[in-house]
């Protein structure tokens, strides 16, 4: 079973957590090590269109996933980011939260991470030549999946 993520079909091998309403996946082109995505299962383009139960699940699970990736990737902080609409930089028409574990000095200026996220999915820079291999992504997902199997 594949997961729908806007115009993309996501293989189960790169999904490391699924709840009744949300799923978490590794990123094919991470801005920092451990950069993952959290999405509602229902393909909804804008945050305002999520139901209250979807919002609650999305953010409760985002909190759990953030805690795990911060620990696993030896971060000291986390950046959570959501681009909601084209003028906000959204390129995938499916609500999603970027979860990025952070470390001191990972960017020259702290806010440079937002510049990196802005160009992260631009069409001219989003080609398979820039993506990680399916094997690498599946291996990372397998490691992260273990944190949630209790």
Curated annotation (Swiss-Prot):
State which Enzyme Commission number(s) the record gives.
3.6.1.29, 3.9.1.-, 3.6.2.1, 2.7.7.51
Q: Name one GO cellular component term.
A: plasma membrane
Task: Classify the source by domain of life.
Answer: Eukaryota
- Domain HIT: from-to ranges: 2-109
SUPFAM superfamilies hit by this protein: HIT-like
Keywords, sorted A to Z:
Apoptosis, Cytoplasm, Hydrolase, Magnesium, Manganese, Mitochondrion, Nucleotide-binding, Nucleus, Phosphoprotein, Transcription, Transcription regulation, Transferase
Pfam family of this protein, just one?
Answer: HIT
Q: How would you summarize the oligomeric state and partners of this protein?
A: Homodimer. Interacts with UBE2I. Interacts with MDM2. Interacts with CTNNB1. Identified in a complex with CTNNB1 and LEF1.
Q: Tell me, what does this protein do in biology? A: Possesses dinucleoside triphosphate hydrolase activity. Cleaves P(1)-P(3)-bis(5'-adenosyl) triphosphate (Ap3A) to yield AMP and ADP. Can also hydrolyze P(1)-P(4)-bis(5'-adenosyl) tetraphosphate (Ap4A), but has extremely low activity with ATP. Exhibits adenylylsulfatase activity, hydrolyzing adenosine 5'-phosphosulfate to yield AMP and sulfate. Exhibits adenosine 5'-monophosphoramidase activity, hydrolyzing purine nucleotide phosphoramidates with a single phosphate group such as adenosine 5'monophosphoramidate (AMP-NH2) to yield AMP and NH2.
What is the name listed in the Swiss-Prot or TrEMBL entry for this protein?
Bis(5'-adenosyl)-triphosphatase
């Amino acid at each position: 079973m594949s997961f729908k993520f806007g115009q993309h079909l996501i293989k189960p091998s790169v999904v490391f957590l699924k709840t009744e309403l949300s799923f978490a996946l590794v990123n094919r082109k991470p801005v920092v090590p451990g950069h993952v995505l959290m999405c509602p299962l229902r393909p909804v383009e804008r945050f305002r269109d999520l139901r209250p139960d979807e919002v609650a699940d999305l953010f409760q699970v985002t909190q759990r996933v953030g805690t795990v990736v911060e620990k696993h990737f030896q971060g000291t902080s986390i950046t959570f980011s959501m681009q909601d609409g084209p003028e906000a930089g959204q390129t995938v028409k499916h609500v999603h939260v970027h979860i990025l574990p952070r470390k001191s000095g990972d960017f020259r200026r702290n806010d440079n991470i937002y510049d990196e996220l802005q160009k992260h999915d631009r069409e001219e820079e989003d080609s398979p030549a820039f993506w990680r291999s399916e094997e690498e992504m599946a291996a990372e997902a397998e490691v992260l999946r273990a944190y949630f199997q209790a």
